[in-house]
Amino acid sequence: MAPRRRRRAARSSRPLLLALLAAAVNNFAPAGGVEVLAKSRLESCARGGSDDGRDRLTCDSKIVVDLAVPSGSASLVARVAEVEENGTEAGEMPIRDPLIITINKSEVYALYDLTYLRDVAYKPEEKFVKTRKCEPEAGANVVKSCERLRDEKGSIIEHTEPVCCPCGPHRRVPSSCGNILDKVAKGKANTAHCLRFPDDWFHVFDIGRRSLWFSIRVQVKKGSSESEVIVGPENRTVVSEDSSLRVNLVGDFAGYTSLPSLENFYLVTPRKGVGGGQLEVLGDDFSRWMLLERVLFTLDGLECNKIGVGYEAFRSQPNFCSSPLDSCLGDQLSKFWEIDKNRVNNSQPPQYVVLGKFERINQYPNAGVHTFSVGIPEVLNTNLMIELSADDIEYVYQRSSGKIISINISSFEALSQVGSARVKTKNIGRLEASYSLTFDCLSGINPVEEQYFIMKPDEKLIRTFDLRSSTDQASNYTCQAILKASDFSELDRKESQFSTTATVLNNGTQIGSSENHTKGGIWGFFEAIKAWCAKMWHMLINFFTGTTCSTRCWSFLKFVIHGLLLVAVLWLLHRKGLFDPLYYWWDGVVGSEAQERARRRHKRAHSHRHSHHHDAHKRHKTELAGHRRHHVLHIHDDDDPVAAAAAAEHVILRRHGRHEAALGVQHRDGLKLNKHRRHGGKAVALLPPGEIIVRDGGGCGGVEHGDRRHHAWH
């Protein structure tokens, strides 16, 4: 009998083994991949402390089935119809109510944590205005759309002033400088350049840790009763309410293809609407969602040719005026979207746009409005252990009581910050035991994984869970922590409430202009005074440092320097005699004529002045002189002709002296008049050889001397 009983004991597990294998192979061969890894019967015993201080060992028998369940909504139905009871000779006995085990596994998703960083412009634009007298502080009447921007408070946004470039064919914008008259009358031509952002913005999210999400539902049906549990990465071990079923998610088998890792990428999604200051629902327009490497971004806006470039980087680029237009605005979002658009039109897969690159985008059932998940196309096997009975293996685990002491959760900003839940637990039993802790929120918070740990008697331990909001709105949440014993039975449960603040949009250094700022009132007056004081202080500093003059006075200094240089060159050429032929020609053309006209004008003026003052006097003197001369001649005519001639000569000489003094007659030969000497009763006048011409201004008479000749005329 003994050998026979040993033979039956050896065969005791075979009917169950065959039943499970038949169910797996016959019912689900088309599903492909559902494999039964191991089956056994084991004696499961638990040792726990009692009130009387003694350890107690409680055992029960269960069936353990270890399965490899693939992804893709795979199912397994096992029907346990026969069992063999140990120690009996009845053999296999049918079960009145066979056990039917049904396993369903959902699609597998890769879920990525998102952290909001800032907003960036889709396509920054460089605007330029051809103008004159461009200055960074110039108003709209000079630089037009490149005028400095102001925020909603009316304050000037830093680094938004235009950059002024001179004219020329090889400048940033080739332009004509015009002629010299335009420069003098209107000012030197130049161009004003500025950076502006149109109203097309994208959210930028940092992609953090990756986690897998799927769910496995296990149902055990016996007659009219049914037990069901659902396990997943966030809740790996579950016991049914009637304790007849225990399912443990052991882990996943690695596949041949690695899962997409996006830690080095940023996710950009279009922003819906303008303004509001709040993130909106991202929607399902995945054709504009893009994954771009982090090195393509500048979050501080201080680098050119990167997404997120700001005003300061645009103005500070080297060789600004000699660089081509848009030299700082390369590699923007618009460029990458256009690249993928052309690839799709050519029947090629996209490189950056998520649509067409991944499957089942954001179809994760518990996805929030700001979550990112993609489907895993590869078949991923999950190791699942189902406990129904035990026989072949005996093992002992220690079970001890425990409780949750406190839960501390601080408020945090939705999407842009990560919350932290600190759960403090304590082992209140007398044995060292293992525990599991789950943290579950009703909605709005991404699920977190269950944690396993060991505590010694009276030991307190704090476990931390990272909380990430799936919405950008401020909200209140209620979550509960569940402490389980080593046999996965629930020991304690505690609820906690916390709140999140709304996500605040941040454009970084790409600040746009606000047209809604208000001015006026007492605050506007104070702001004006503040701005004036700041301007005066700035001007004072620039006066001592020379900063303003180096920028504003440079054009004037260049004009003065060039003018002085031109004058110096012309003076040197003049000293060398280069312009002498020109001088001679000019004198020949206009010099003699000008001198003649000047002489005639001078003569007319001189004659006119003397004619008014001396005409009457001259006429009187002329008549008187003529009368005297006639009287003298008349007196001496009859008595002595020689004396009459001498008297006439004397009268002429007297007139000659007066005219000489009045008209400034110069004697070329030094005229000398000798005294009258009486010789032979005659008066003789001795004159030196020379020529003296004395003419009366009125033309009435004159004296002319020449080579011992004397002429007198009336």
UniProtKB/Swiss-Prot annotation:
It comes from Oryza sativa subsp. japonica (Rice). This is Protein HAPLESS 2-B. It is found in: Endoplasmic reticulum membrane; Cell membrane. InterPro entries: HAP2/GCS1, HAP2/GCS1_dom. One of its GO terms (molecular function) is lipid binding. Disulfide bonds join C45-C59, C134-C164, C146-C194, C165-C321, C167-C177, C304-C328, C441-C479. The lineage of its organism: Eukaryota, Viridiplantae, Streptophyta, Embryophyta, Tracheophyta. Residues 34-552 are extracellular. The gene is HAP2B. The chain crosses the membrane at residues 553-573. Keywords: Cell membrane, Disulfide bond, Endoplasmic reticulum, Fertilization, Lipid-binding, Membrane, Signal, Transmembrane, Transmembrane helix. HAP2/GCS1 family members mediate membrane fusion between gametes in a broad range of eukaryotes, ranging from algae and higher plants to protozoans and cnidaria, suggesting they are derived from an ancestral gamete fusogen. They function similar to viral fusogens, by inserting part of their extracellular domain into the lipid bilayer of an adjoining cell. Residues 597-619 are annotated as: Disordered. Residues 598-619 have a biased composition (Basic residues). One of its GO terms (cellular component) is plasma membrane. Residues 1-33 form the signal peptide. It comes from the Eukaryota. Residues 574-714 are cytoplasmic.
